[in-house]
């Protein structure tokens, strides 16, 4: 996907909630407003390599990258933020849904599994079910 580098809110299609940082490393979805500070709901999305289609997603709040915990390849592994490193657990493919303009899936390069949010607001990677809990909108912030 040709995605311009920039700062975005990442909104879950199913719940309408935004991806946000809680504390130092915990990532959840929550309302687009208090109690989370604005920076905790904003993500710099930048290509890993120019033209490669793989991206880092960096929290504006603490400048840490969206990361699959322990570089897990298992379905259900939690997603967090972590300091920059050279592992594929911090690299994401932004896959556009051609049948739903503006909707994307965020695929973890380490596992090939999509980012999803559950009903309790937890964020993890999971088996691809092609469901709205795994669909996201990238809204320029």
Give the residues covered by each predicted segment.
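Lectin-like carbohydrate-binding module/patch detector with strong preference for beta-trefoil
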Residues: 1-141
């Amino acid at each position: 996907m040709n995605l311009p580098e920039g700062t975005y809110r990442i909104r879950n299609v199913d719940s309408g909630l935004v991806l946000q940082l809680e504390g130092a490393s915990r990532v959840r979805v929550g309302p687009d407003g208090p109690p989370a500070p604005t920076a905790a709901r904003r993500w710099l999305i930048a290509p890993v390599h120019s033209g490669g289609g793989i991206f880092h997603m960096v929290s504006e709040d603490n400048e840490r990258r969206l990361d699959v915990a322990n570089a897990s390849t298992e379905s259900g592994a939690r997603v967090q933020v972590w300091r920059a490193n050279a592992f594929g657990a911090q690299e994401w493919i932004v896959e556009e849904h051609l049948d739903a303009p503006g909707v994307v899936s965020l695929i973890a390069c380490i596992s090939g599994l999509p980012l999803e949010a559950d009903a309790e607001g937890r964020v993890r990677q999971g088996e691809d079910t092609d469901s709205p809990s795994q669909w996201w909108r990238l809204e320029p912030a």
